[in-house]
């Protein structure tokens, strides 16, 4: 190892270690704030959100308190006083904002946004599965490794297990807590990239937008929160013309504070992601860690983020080659020095891109290896239809900057800032590449509809809004600074701008419960795992699940995780960790499970003419046969309401009913038990 290598390794270790230490401290603060807040909310019997405005009012009060903490932190930073207290206030303020914005409206229910309906059902099922055991197992099917990334759910399962909670019951506090942690981690990352007072403001803006538009899908919202600073970090890792020995263009020049007040408040401004002493390798490691995290949490956002980072790498390589050519042009009074082919200038950013990919792949392998290995050796027909969904939002380009709203105005400011500062701001370049990547992905998603699939571009609204809102926050601050200078630095101007910013933020923040009203209402109208509705109205059929669970365990004599149940009421599997013979729809089914083949087999079973024939068919099943059937009862028949993919239609699912004659189970090999509207049929060994 050379002296130069040692000189870079030590700062790298110091920077990474310091960043990790600060991130751990911030995460602990977020966990404490979220835990204290959620416990405090649970101590009072609140009225339901959908029948009273009490929780909405208290949410607004809590948001004002959180905003006050953030303002206090910014004031301390600008006055260069009590930096540790300022950091603590900023972490607590962001975590409190997340906790009160989501936790207070949901205070009277045990369910998270959207209850256990639609997509939230399979997410709850996944968390229940990984609460029951840390082993990587499919959410529904026995003996198959999971296809959907298990990272967020695995951590949640371990949290639920430590707390002694059922998976469904831990979903809400874990989702809110994980979002609080992600928000403060984004703040920590921003403070490593830009001046601290700006970092607090930018994080607050992107967090508010993420809560409004990404929070129902909590595990993806974690990536949305981290995406903006991660892209800036990635650009700092890949585009380092000075560090690579080339002539720096304007885009690589630091962006220092320009006013006297800013110079006093911030002694130095970060113009690149990592100080040059580390050679950008700290940013490389950080970017790889982010992409690895995305790979273990949410495949779609991994794809988009990796696409954006790849575009950055190619752009950085192009700029490096161009800069190398410029250095070889003869100038008056200077000689041209040949240093080898100009294409070699592209190697440093491409090498860094490769290292980022390797780091991400190593992390992704933790959750992806089992299913990839199984796919390589399995002969089961692939049946995944996860990409078969094209709502109207996926057939149009999202243009939030043209909407007449507070968020639309912020996105418009962000769009203008991205264009104006594209040649002079590394932040604008990084965020701009991210926005460009999303629009290119959206167009590609529309294009591949001709091939019978999509790239689910409709789910990119949240990251797009987060990026544009982040850019809008920068645009607002820099625009206000420019106006301040143009007006000869009037005495009260900055105070007026700050007041307008705070009022605008509060106006948007207090509207978040309204934006999430359908999701919050569903959390109160769905029947939870205790068989109750939080709005105190009569519960649905799920109130019989506890009795069904008891009968199942008594009649089979096996643990839940060793029992396979065929049922169309898959919410039962979300509350109890039984394996299912068939998933809710093919879109959530593991491709290794052969959803279509199982559906055809179920129909064949229903058409058999005797119990003996059914017993024989179950014994010959190519998959592990059901140990129990959970039907809806309809006269002398037992029914299952199943689903099939009808893409490209919207809705993309058609429900159909399969009926089993009750006489088909009139045999000592089967035990039938009527429980409420259900009939439970267990199969004797």
Q: What is each PLM-predicted segment?
A:
Residues 1-33, 40-107:
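Start-transfer (signal-anchor) and selected internal transmembrane alpha helices
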Residues 48-59, 112, 164, 212-222, ...:
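Membrane-helix boundary/interfacial segments in multi-pass membrane proteins
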Residues 87-99, 356-360, 364, 489-515:
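Internal/C-terminal transmembrane anchor helices
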Residues 94-101, 179-318:
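Membrane-embedded helix bundles of polyisoprenyl
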Residues 101-224, 534:
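Active-site lumenal/periplasmic loops and adjacent helix-entry segments of GT-C-fold
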Residues 112, 119, 218-223, 292-432:
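Transmembrane catalytic cores of multi-pass membrane glycosyltransferases
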Residues 504-606, 617-648, 668-683:
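Short periplasmic/luminal acceptor-recognition loop of GT-C membrane glycosyltransferases, typified by
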């Amino acid at each position: 190892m050379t002296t130069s290598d040692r000189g870079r390794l030590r700062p790298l270790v110091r920077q990474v270690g310091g960043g990790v230490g600060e991130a751990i401290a911030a995460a602990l603060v977020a966990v404490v704030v979220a835990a204290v807040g959620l416990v405090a909310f649970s101590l009072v019997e609140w009225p339901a959100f959908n029948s009273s405005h009490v929780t909405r009012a208290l949410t607004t009060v809590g948001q004002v308190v959180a905003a006050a903490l953030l303002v206090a932190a910014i004031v301390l930073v600008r006055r260069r006083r009590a930096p540790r207290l300022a950091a603590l206030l900023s972490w607590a303020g962001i975590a409190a904002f997340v906790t009160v914005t989501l936790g207070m409206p949901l205070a009277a229910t045990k369910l998270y946004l959207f209850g256990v309906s639609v997509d939230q059902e399979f997410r709850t099922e996944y968390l229940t599965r990984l609460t029951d055991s840390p082993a990587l197992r499919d959410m529904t099917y026995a003996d198959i490794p999971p296809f959907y990334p298990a990272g967020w759910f695995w951590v949640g399962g371990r949290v639920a297990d430590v707390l002694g909670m059922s998976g469904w019951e831990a979903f809400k506090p874990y989702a809110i807590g994980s979002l609080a942690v992600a928000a403060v981690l984004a703040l920590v990352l921003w403070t490593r990239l830009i001046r601290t007072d700006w970092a607090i403001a930018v994080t607050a803006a992107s967090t508010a937008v993420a809560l409004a538009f990404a929070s129902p899908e909590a595990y993806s919202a974690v990536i949305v929160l981290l995406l903006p600073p991660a892209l800036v970090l990635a650009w700092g890792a890949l585009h380092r013309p000075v560090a690579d020995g080339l002539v720096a263009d304007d885009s690589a020049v630091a962006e220092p504070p320009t006013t006297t007040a800013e110079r006093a408040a911030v002694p130095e401004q970060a113009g690149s992601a990592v100080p040059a002493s580390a050679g950008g390798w700290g940013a490389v490691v950080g970017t790889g860690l982010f992409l690895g995290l995305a790979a273990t949490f949410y495949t779609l956002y991994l794809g988009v983020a990796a696409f954006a980072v790849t575009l950055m790498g190619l752009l950085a390589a192009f700029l490096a080659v161009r800069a190398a050519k410029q250095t070889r042009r003869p100038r008056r009074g200077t000689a041209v020095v040949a240093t080898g082919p100009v294409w070699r200038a592209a190697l440093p950013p491409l090498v860094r891109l490769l290292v980022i990919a390797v780091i991400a792949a190593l992390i992704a392998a933790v959750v992806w290896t089992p299913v990839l290995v199984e796919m390589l050796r399995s002969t089961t027909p692939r049946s995944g239809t996860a990409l078969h969904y094209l709502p109207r939002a996926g057939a149009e380009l999202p243009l939030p900057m043209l909407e007449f709203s507070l968020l639309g105005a912020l996105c418009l400011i962000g769009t203008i800032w991205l264009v104006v500062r594209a040649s002079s701001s590394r932040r604008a370049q990084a965020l701009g590449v991210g926005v460009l990547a999303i629009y290119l992905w959206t167009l590609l998603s529309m294009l591949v509809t001709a091939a019978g699939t999509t790239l689910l571009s409709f789910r990119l609204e949240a990251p797009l809004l987060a990026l544009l809102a982040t850019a809008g926050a920068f645009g607002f601050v820099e625009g206000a600074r420019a106006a301040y200078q143009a007006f000869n630095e009037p005495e009260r101007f900055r105070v007026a701008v700050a007041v307008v910013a705070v009022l605008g933020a509060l106006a948007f923040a207090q509207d978040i419960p309204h934006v999430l009203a359908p999701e919050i209402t569903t959390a109160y109208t769905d029947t939870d795992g205790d068989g109750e509705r939080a709005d105190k109205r009569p519960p649905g059929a799920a109130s019989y699940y506890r009795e069904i669970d008891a009968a199942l365990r008594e009649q089979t004599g096996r643990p839940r995780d060793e029992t396979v149940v065929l049922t169309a009421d898959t919410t039962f599997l979300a509350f109890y960790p039984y394996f299912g013979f068939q998933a809710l729809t093919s879109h959530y089914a593991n491709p290794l499970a052969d959803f279509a083949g199982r559906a055809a087999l179920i129909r064949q079973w229903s058409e058999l003419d005797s119990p003996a024939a059914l017993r024989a068919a179950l014994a010959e099943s190519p998959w592990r046969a059901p140990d129990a059937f959970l039907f809806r009862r309809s006269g002398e028949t037992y029914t299952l309401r199943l689903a099939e993919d009808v893409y490209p239609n919207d809705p993309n699912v058609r429900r159909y009913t399969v009926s089993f004659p009750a006489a088909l189970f009139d045999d000592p090999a089967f035990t039938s038990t009527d429980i409420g509207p259900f009939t439970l049929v267990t199969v004797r060994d």
